Amino acid sequence: MTIELKPGGLLIAIEGIDGAGKTTLARRLTTTLEAAGARVVLSKEPTNGPWGTKLRQSAATGRLSADEEAELLIRDRHEHVDTLIAPALARGDIVILDRYFPSMVAYQGAAGLPLDELLELNAFAPRPDVLLLLDLPPPTGLARIRARGDAPNHFETQDNLERCRTIFAGLELPGKHVVDASADADSVLRQAHAIIVAALADRLSGDGAPADTGKAALELLSAGRPA
């Protein structure tokens, strides 16, 4: 059985400071939901497009100002929404994003740009149905970055990550759920899966689908709950 969520699909954004485990969770959620019959599109920001590539180069070298990075982020996100996110949601897919516009608000905000202006710049971007905020202390995130053999970039200082964490915590967005990312990866996956199943229950009961179809879909998703 293929689980479709028309109209509108389901948009899931995974956020948090560096080292929180966003990429690991995004990949594991995709595998878990696909195994249960969901049609999932996994993506990330910055993307691999021309604007996203410039942004990653900037993260490594620190050559761009906060304003210049913000401009590239918006260009990258416009293209991402138009070419991938909006079409996938229109098909009724589940879209999982490893970072989205809240990261821009947190990181560019930590660099000194006004939060209200950053939110206004992102008004065009579809709001997530589920926003999973992976929260952990910056020293833990930095230790994880070093443990995987990566050298911290200019964003990845304890002071900057503390500022980002504070901004993430203060963002008031619908669908936001705080997940304890200091726990092991299996525990984080279980927390996230339970949140998503609850969101899917709301969507499947309210999108006009036959009751038996929604029930069968939820049974499949619940059966795929991580042990």
From Swiss-Prot:
Its EC number is 2.7.4.9. It catalyses: dTMP + ATP = dTDP + ADP. Keywords: ATP-binding, Kinase, Nucleotide biosynthesis, Nucleotide-binding, Transferase. GO terms for cellular component: cytosol. ATP binds at residues 16-23. HAMAP family: Thymidylate_kinase. PANTHER family: THYMIDYLATE KINASE, UMP-CMP KINASE 2, MITOCHONDRIAL. This is Thymidylate kinase. The gene is tmk.
